[in-house]
Structure formats: structure tokens, C-alpha cells
Swiss-Prot record:
Coiled coil: none annotated. Part of the high-affinity ATP-driven potassium transport (or Kdp) system, which catalyzes the hydrolysis of ATP coupled with the electrogenic transport of potassium into the cytoplasm. This subunit acts as a catalytic chaperone that increases the ATP-binding affinity of the ATP-hydrolyzing subunit KdpB by the formation of a transient KdpB/KdpC/ATP ternary complex. It comes from Clostridium botulinum (strain Eklund 17B / Type B). Its main location: membrane. The system is composed of three essential subunits: KdpA, KdpB and KdpC. InterPro entries: KdpC (IPR003820). Belongs to the KdpC family. This is Potassium-transporting ATPase KdpC subunit. The chain crosses the membrane at residues 13-33. Keywords: ATP-binding, Cell membrane, Ion transport, Membrane, Nucleotide-binding, Potassium, Potassium transport, Transmembrane, Transmembrane helix, Transport. It is a single-pass membrane protein. Pfam families: KdpC.
Length: 201
């Protein structure tokens, strides 16, 4: 008991010091630095035009009409959780289906058929895999350059645009490899679609 009484005050002081340092000072310092150096990224990389917010470049938005660029399959559940007022809450997660299962095979086939039906000009050209599969998060905001270029003709036709103009928009919102060597080039779906709509210039 004596040992406890001797150690406890010291442990409590250390606990309080590190709580203040790590929970308070460190948090305030990092928040302040991030707001000073890169405020847009620190606040969620929100796209805002003329005072209206259209979404974050870091989160996918659902587009499935013929005029817009389609992103990866979004895996969102709106049936499991509700808030205190009974309003449905959306959350995303990867699918638990086995790639070898019949259910997954049928699901991918359904997606492939939809892609082919909406892109008849591509004939038997291989469909980029990211157009028929989910990402790990279920909310991936990017697709591959190949997946974006696959949709160019449909987008141009349904927006009365020239193919080269659609390609220019895609090129504008294509990010290069990290440090020039890591990963692959990716296209931000939301930015492309806002540019197609004339919101982003």
C-alpha cells in the first residue's frame, strides 16, 4: 500500500502531462499547421463553386446516367443503421462475396452486360476491371485512365460534345503516378462530371 501511495501521485502527474501534450497541445498544433499550410485538404478537399458545395474529391459520388462518367461500383449499405430520429445512415464496406462464388460471378456478369449495353461502339473490347468491381472502401473517387477512355464516346454522344473535348476534360483531371513511379494514373470522376456540366472550368 505504501508503494502504491508513493507511485500513484507520480503516475498521475505523468498521465496528466501526456494527456495535455498529446491530447491538447499536439492536436491544436497539428490542426493549426494543417489549416495554415493546406486548409483545403485539412477541411476535406471540398469542391465549392460560387458558394455551393458539390462534394469531396476524396469520396465517390453516384453517377449512372448516360451523360456522365461512371465510377467504380459503390458498395453502400443504407438498411442496417438508423439515427435517433429513424433516418437511415449510409456506410460503406467491401463485399464479403468470394470471387470464386456463383453469386459473385452472376453479379459481375450483370455489371458487364450493363456496360456493354451502354457502350455498343466498343464491341468486344475488354472492359476495364474497375468498371465492374468495387474498391476496398466502396467509395473510391477515382478510376483508371482506361476506364475513363472506355466511356468517351457515350459521354460525347449524350452531351452533344466532340470526342476530343471529352478527352481534354479527362486529361485535365487525370493525376499522375506518385513521385512519377508509384501506382498508376487515375481520373477523378466527380471533377470530370462537374466539368462536363460546366460547373468546373
Amino acid at each position: 500500500m505504501k508503494e502504491f501511495k508513493a507511485v500513484f501521485p507520480k503516475a498521475l502527474i505523468i498521465f496528466m502531462i501526456f494527456t495535455i501534450l498529446c491530447g491538447g497541445i499536439y492536436t491544436i498544433f497539428i490542426t493549426g499547421i494543417s489549416q495554415l499550410i493546406f486548409p483545403k485538404q485539412a477541411n476535406g478537399s471540398i469542391i465549392e463553386v460560387n458558394g455551393k458545395k458539390y462534394g469531396s474529391v476524396l469520396l465517390a459520388q453516384q453517377y449512372n446516367d448516360e451523360k456522365h462518367l461512371w465510377g467504380r461500383i459503390m458498395n453502400i449499405d443504407t438498411d442496417t443503421f438508423v439515427d435517433d430520429n429513424g433516418k437511415k445512415l449510409a456506410y460503406s464496406a467491401p463485399s464479403n462475396l468470394s470471387p470464386a462464388s456463383k453469386e459473385y460471378e452472376a453479379l459481375v456478369k450483370e455489371r458487364v452486360d450493363k456496360i456493354k449495353a451502354n457502350h455498343p461502339e466498343q464491341d468486344d473490347k475488354a472492359i476495364p476491371v474497375d468498371l465492374v468491381t468495387c474498391s476496398g472502401s466502396g467509395l473510391d473517387p477515382h478510376i483508371s485512365v482506361a476506364a475513363a477512355k472506355y466511356q468517351v464516346n457515350r459521354i460525347a454522344k449524350n452531351n452533344n460534345m466532340k470526342i476530343k473535348d471529352v478527352e481534354k476534360i479527362i486529361d485535365k483531371y487525370t493525376s499522375g503516378k506518385l513521385f512519377g513511379v508509384l501506382g498508376e494514373k487515375t481520373v477523378n470522376v466527380l471533377e470530370v462530371n462537374l466539368a462536363i456540366d460546366g460547373i468546373l472550368k
